[in-house]
Design a protein with these regions (language model features):
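Asp-box/WD-like beta-propeller blade repeats and closely related beta-sheet repeat scaffolds
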Residues: 77-129, 144-151
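Residue-level detector of Asp-centered blade-edge/turn motifs that repeat once per structural unit
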Residues: 18-20, 66-70, 110-113, 164-166
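A conserved active-site cap/scaffold subdomain adjacent to cofactor or substrate pockets
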Residues: 157-180, 188
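Repeated scaffold domains used in trafficking and secretory/extracellular systems
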Residues: 12-15, 59-64, 102-110, 153-161
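Surface-exposed loop/turn elements that mediate protein-protein interactions on large endomembrane-trafficking
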Residues: 1-6, 35-50, 84-98, 131-152, ...
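Blade-loop segments of beta-propeller domains
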Residues: 3-10, 43-70, 77
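Conserved beta-propeller blade signature
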Residues: 22-25, 72-74, 116-117, 168-170
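Beta-strand-rich domains and repeat architectures in extracellular enzymes and scaffolds
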Residues: 1-32
Length: 194
């Protein structure tokens, strides 16, 4: 069981990742925080909570990503339209990454300096019908991917369509019967439900 104290209470588990000896848990319901617990004994270690809109602060975390390559934790705040980078070990703030456009639904970090975002289709077509956008840390769009079906306008399903399986980045778009793998800067179908 996880430690329960005033500082470690949470209202929901919206995302959960395990890395090394730690559990990273996102609660958007009660605390607007990423909480960190020990995998060995469930003890609460620390948290970063939504406290404001200054440097290193967020209001409503939507999702997070652990970059295993550089030891960083990224937190997406859709309300403030910003992506924040923290040190994975001590949760010290490191940088703010500029988004290519307002309010992506999800993101990941496929390689250092590159950010892959998932955007819903909108009335104003921002990316030529594509839903996945690769951008640099300044928010400059490098390339776009995935011709979205009409159902791409419906915001329902997994809020974190990116995941790593057997060391490979995978993507599962909303309402899709396919799973894609990020290979050589492109999305390739790796599994399809028939």
């Amino acid at each position: 069981p996880l430690e329960t104290s005033d500082e470690s209470l949470f209202g929901s588990i919206d995302q959960l990742e395990v890395w090394k000896d730690r559990i990273y848990l996102l609660d958007t319901y009660k605390t607007n925080a990423v909480l960190v617990f020990s995998t060995t004994d469930g003890k609460f270690i620390q948290k970063i909570a939504g406290t404001g809109n200054g440097p290193g602060e967020f209001l409503t975390p939507h999702s997070f990503w652990i970059d295993y390559h550089d030891g960083s934790l990224y937190v997406l705040d859709r309300m403030m339209s910003k992506l924040l980078k923290y040190n994975l070990e001590n949760l010290d703030y490191e940088a703010e990454i500029k988004l290519p456009e307002l309010s992506p639904l999800a993101f990941c970090v496929p390689t250092e300096g590159d950010y892959l975002y998932y955007f819903p289709l909108r009335k104003k077509d921002l990316f030529g019908g594509k839903q996945y956008v690769k951008a640099d840390e300044k928010g400059k769009v490098v390339s776009t991917y995935y011709d979205a079906p009409a159902s791409g306008k419906i915001l329902h399903g997994n809020s974190a369509p990116f995941y790593v399986y057997e060391g490979k980045l995978r993507v599962c778009p909303y309402f899709s019967n396919r799973v894609y793998e990020w290979v050589n800067d492109s999305l390739k179908v790796c599994w399809e439900m028939k």
